[in-house]
């Protein structure tokens, strides 16, 4: 559709107007100062939503399984990984919320416009496949919760799918966000379950802040679980979802500060949920035959009913269903947003299905397809779950690299580009994520990978990656010093300029000029992706046909 917004790159006219959040409204064009505490609180309440939804959606069915496995198999010894992931979560999601507020263009479309058709097409297709499989795992979580509650699986799955579809298709953005906020509140059911089990708080406090490895655990298994925690916590769909949702909510640069606060609240909730699941599972199964023998999240609910109380099991099952619902909703939306963005179609929750048919069709088909697969007897759900992990490992490096490059593109972000220290930290994080991605992908393709191989890859890759990132940072500092770019950076723009700067229409942007080193790394990334995809297809085909 045509862009009706002058001097801005916003692709859908529905993305411009009043901010109508679950808890308040901000009029379009309102850039007035918020001087009193009450004014700031009202503004924050209106902005609340994107950060909370994406972070609580991160604690979905897959996260329940991963965190419960960590607690049941290794106690609370891996809690420290959650603390280390806090800055990673914040930096990644802060960059995409900044991209969304400043550009008004979704993540997939920016990749297409700035890096070409290959990368744009790859990102959209890979995201679609990964998200479609992820939504299946959400409905697996729903069936596990229904099973413990004694409710019929077929009717329960159909009702869940219908609820998720209906919530997004009213043509009222505020109504969808209020539905999502209800799910966010229900995610806190994990807290009373945690308190009921009476886990050792002193041990939890120790393991949160003192890194250590489980005694007697096989290093390769522990490392793969740690990588699983990272992959669960830092998922590619989150980047695409939050950027598009910030755009759809009509958040502008004026309110980035408030959206950052929203993100921090979401991170606090995701941390509370993760600690509750790990701590509760560890205390529940300590000294029991089930310790070290994790099955699935449904078995954890059964364990609560067996060793504690039926109420605790019910609350956990309801929390699992709740997490699966918000996960299915957010992941489906991220896909529909991305495809519609790339194909230049209407894509907004402010529109009714009759006014954005393709956008809602993608959303409905993803939900209906996932629900149907779960209900079909004989579908290899375990294979689908492994495929999700593998595809996440394949997509994460490219998503991390593109995010970093886009946040250094001055034509895209203007005065909102990354600072030098943000770049250094983000570069190191991206290097670590790429390294973990390689190990995760390799572990699925070769399940018998040895502990020594993992250690060698971590140490060798960590040293090489650290040297490359630091060297690139030093080279950039020298180049900036020679060109005077560092002096320009020190002359900070005014607050009003920052609050009103938006990316110009895509057609007005100059072609992105990649340095020789950037082009080299893009070629390496393309080669890695080609090899990884071929190996994944081979492995999945082998397992499907031969069963091993």
PLM segments and residue spans:
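Juxtamembrane transmembrane-helix boundary signature
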Residues: 54, 81-114, 122-129, 133
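Transmembrane alpha-helical segments of multi-pass small-molecule transport proteins
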Residues: 124-125, 148-169, 186-190, 357-369, ...
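Extracellular/periplasmic helix-exit of transmembrane alpha-helices
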Residues: 88-102, 246-247, 268-299, 542
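C-terminal membrane-solvent junction of multi-pass transporters and transport-like membrane proteins
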Residues: 351-361, 386-445, 481-484
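Loop-to-transmembrane helix boundary motifs in multi-pass membrane proteins
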Residues: 117-118, 154-159, 265, 269, ...
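A generic transmembrane alpha-helix motif of multi-pass inner-membrane proteins
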Residues: 221-224, 421-485, 526, 530-533, ...
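Hydrophobic alpha-helical segments and their helix-loop junctions in multi-pass secondary transporters
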Residues: 185-213, 223-243, 402-410, 436-444, ...
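Flexible loop linkers connecting adjacent transmembrane helices
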Residues: 26-32, 66-71, 94-119, 174, ...
């Amino acid at each position: 559709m045509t862009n009706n917004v002058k001097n801005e790159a916003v692709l859908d006219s529905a993305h411009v107007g009043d901010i109508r959040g679950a808890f308040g409204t901000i009029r379009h064009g309102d850039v007035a100062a918020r001087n009193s505490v009450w004014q700031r609180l009202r503004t924050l309440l209106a902005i609340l939503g994107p950060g909370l939804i994406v972070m609580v959606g991160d604690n979905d069915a897959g996260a329940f399984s991963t965190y419960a496995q960590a607690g049941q198999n290794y106690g609370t010894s891996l809690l420290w990984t959650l603390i280390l992931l806090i800055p990673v979560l914040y930096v990644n999601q802060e960059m995409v919320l900044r991209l969304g507020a400043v550009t008004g263009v979704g993540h997939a479309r920016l990749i297409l416009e700035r890096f070409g058709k290959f990368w744009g097409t790859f990102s959209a297709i890979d995201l679609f496949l990964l998200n479609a499989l992820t939504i299946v795992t959400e409905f697996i979580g729903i069936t596990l919760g229904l099973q413990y509650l004694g409710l019929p699986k077929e009717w329960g799955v159909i009702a869940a799918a219908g609820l998720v579809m209906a919530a997004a298709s009213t043509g009222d953005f505020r109504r969808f966000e209020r539905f999502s906020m209800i799910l966010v509140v229900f995610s806190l059911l994990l807290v009373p379950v945690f308190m009921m089990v009476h886990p050792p708080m002193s041990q939890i406090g120790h393991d949160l802040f003192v890194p250590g490895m489980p005694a007697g655990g096989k290093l390769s298994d522990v490392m793969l679980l740690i990588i699983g925690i990272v992959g669960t916590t830092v998922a590619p769909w989150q980047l695409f979802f939050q950027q598009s949702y910030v755009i759809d909510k009509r958040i502008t640069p004026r309110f980035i500060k408030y959206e950052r606060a929203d993100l921090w609240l979401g991170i606090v909730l995701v941390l509370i949920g993760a600690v509750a699941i790990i701590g509760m599972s560890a205390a529940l199964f300590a000294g029991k035959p089930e310790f070290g023998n994790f099955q699935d999240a449904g078995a954890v609910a059964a364990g609560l009913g067996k060793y504690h109380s039926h109420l605790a099991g019910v609350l956990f099952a309801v929390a699992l269903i709740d997490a699966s619902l918000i996960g299915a909703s957010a992941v489906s939306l991220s896909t529909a947003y991305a495809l519609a963005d790339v194909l230049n179609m209407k894509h907004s929750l402010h529109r009714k299905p009759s006014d954005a048919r393709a956008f809602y069709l993608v959303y409905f088909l993803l939900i209906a397809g996932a629900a149907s697969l779960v209900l079909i007897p004989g579908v290899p759900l375990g294979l689908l779950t492994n495929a999700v992990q593998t595809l996440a490992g394949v997509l994460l490096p490219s998503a991390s690299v593109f995010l970093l490059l886009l946040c250094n593109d001055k034509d895209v972000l203007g005065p909102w580009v990354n600072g030098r220290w943000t770049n250094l930290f983000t570069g190191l994080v991206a290097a670590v994520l790429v390294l973990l991605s390689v190990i995760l992908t390799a572990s699925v393709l070769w399940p018998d990978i040895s502990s020594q191989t993992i250690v060698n890859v971590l140490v060798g890759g960590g040293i090489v990656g650290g040297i490359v990132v630091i060297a690139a940072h030093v080279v950039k500092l020298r180049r900036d010093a020679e060109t005077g770019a560092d002096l320009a950076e020190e002359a900070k723009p005014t607050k009003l300029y920052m609050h009103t700067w938006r990316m110009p229409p895509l057609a007005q942007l100059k072609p992105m000029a990649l340095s020789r080193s950037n082009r080299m790394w893009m070629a390496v990334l393309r080669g890695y992706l080609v090899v990884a995809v071929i190996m994944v297809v081979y492995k999945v085909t082998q397992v499907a046909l031969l069963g091993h």
